[in-house]
């Protein structure tokens, strides 16, 4: 690993974290194609799908840790949601990340291709949820616990394979299917995604899929760029950026599908 490769990783990580912070979509779905294709395209180094997913798991872990820390005293992280969805997504992500070692590179790219299409669709679905409801720490949140656990387990399994946290799928499900209040969803999804990233990180490290120097570079860039993106996102109209990003992710999905077929 030379300076050119580290610099390339820093730029990729900064762009991914900045966009992630700006429009509120998980960094993994953005960084995966950039890490997979850009280093080899510019001739600095080629990363495998397993290595990319391992690096992503570490980045998501530290990114969500920062979010959970920020919300720790808000009273909006719902303990019941964490018990049911958090434990399920943790188990799913451990299993997914561990068994991803046995999945071929084409198999991992196939899964990303499916999730990329889902991500594009979810970007344009209006976020519902119980906007009009104020929520306090003592107020009970009503939801289907077994449905929530089952969906979280599935999301964890798939996210563990890709080294993602799964927030870009988790949030719409919590809002539209489980009908969780918006503020509780935002705070609790960070905690649930954090647990998912723990499982993914453990599985990836155990199976030797993590390159620690690139992971460290992306961790640093996410801590720097994500807050900047979030600040900018509050001041500008991000709809156009969402549209452009959807086109890029969609194009990546098409490229992956063409390589697989």
From Swiss-Prot:
Membrane topology designation: Multi-pass membrane protein
Superkingdom in the source lineage: Bacteria
Keyword match Metal-binding: no
Keyword entries, A-Z: Cell membrane, Membrane, Transmembrane, Transmembrane helix, Transport
GO cellular component: plasma membrane
Regions crossing the membrane: 10-30, 51-71, 80-100, 106-126, 151-171, 186-206, 210-230, 240-260
Location relative to the cell: Cell membrane
Membership in a protein family: Belongs to the 4-toluene sulfonate uptake permease (TSUP) (TC 2.A.102) family.
Alphabetical list of PANTHER family matching this protein: MEMBRANE TRANSPORTER PROTEIN MJ0441-RELATED, MEMBRANE TRANSPORTER PROTEIN YRKJ-RELATED
This protein's name: Probable membrane transporter protein YrkJ
Phylogenetic lineage: Bacteria, Bacillati, Bacillota, Bacilli, Bacillales
